[in-house]
């Protein structure tokens, strides 16, 4: 037989064998035997070296046509086998559609998210706006605009994660005070805002400390804002969070960005002020820091501190959640232990 006859014979045998193939392994073996590098077609085409220049294109075109035809029929056969395998599996696997399905367990919001949303709802009801800020902050806004110049000794109060000399992970949400005052148009009225978010300190993680935690900054700036406004606001918020019978105690303190500054304690909700292990037998629990916005902070935002005044405060979400729900280890918020989290579904 000449090469043309050999290719035609190979074509007929290959297509005939293809019809009887019943599984994918046999199908792949057939392709290898007939068209592989060491297959029959390759052996036949080795004889092209003995052909004339006129005969070679004819044989080459015939071989290519055979490859194309086999390729199309190969893919069709492969699809047929896959469909047959699927049909057989469906027939062998019985499914009783009347059986009840598997119940899907609903997820829930994280306890810190629940706490934040509850606090936000209180302040929204009081006419506050909620603003978001940068977790990667500049030294200028994190410290200098908060009345903490580079040589200020109070910078030692906060161990900071620096990214560069001028860029850091914010140590508090207070930078949003300056950023919001810069953007606010005071000719249209005063400013009332809260800024929730993550903050970072170089603390060693233990039961009461974390290198990352959540803080809600509050700020009110307008004409004729007084300490009485601050006291009334926090009294309302704390009673909504911890119960109407709670009382607040105000202690002098120091924060560079407020003057005067105060620490606010809440009467113990477990013992009613009699003294217990929760309040360390004092009857009071430290809950937040606050104060009147320092005149320097106002002036750096372009406000006349003789005309405008304001108050600011900082709430720790983890601390509030721990006190409300009797949680004694802050690490539980971040470890993703379902046994802990599902208590607050």
Curated annotation (Swiss-Prot):
PROSITE patterns: AA_TRNA_LIGASE_II. Keywords: Aminoacyl-tRNA synthetase, ATP-binding, Cytoplasm, Ligase, Magnesium, Metal-binding, Nucleotide-binding, Protein biosynthesis. GO terms for molecular function: ATP binding; catalytic activity, acting on a protein; magnesium ion binding; phenylalanine-tRNA ligase activity; transferase activity; tRNA binding. Mg(2+) binds at residue 259. Its EC number is 6.1.1.20. It holds the Pfam family tRNA-synt_2d. Its cofactor is Mg(2+). One of its GO terms (biological process) is phenylalanyl-tRNA aminoacylation. It catalyses: tRNA(Phe) + L-phenylalanine + ATP = L-phenylalanyl-tRNA(Phe) + AMP + diphosphate + H(+). Binds 2 magnesium ions per tetramer. One of its GO terms (cellular component) is cytoplasm. It is an enzyme of class 6 (ligase). It is found in: Cytoplasm. NCBIfam families: pheS (TIGR00468). Tetramer of two alpha and two beta subunits. Belongs to the class-II aminoacyl-tRNA synthetase family. Phe-tRNA synthetase alpha subunit type 1 subfamily. HAMAP family: Phe_tRNA_synth_alpha1. This is Phenylalanine--tRNA ligase alpha subunit. It comes from Lactococcus lactis subsp. cremoris (strain SK11).
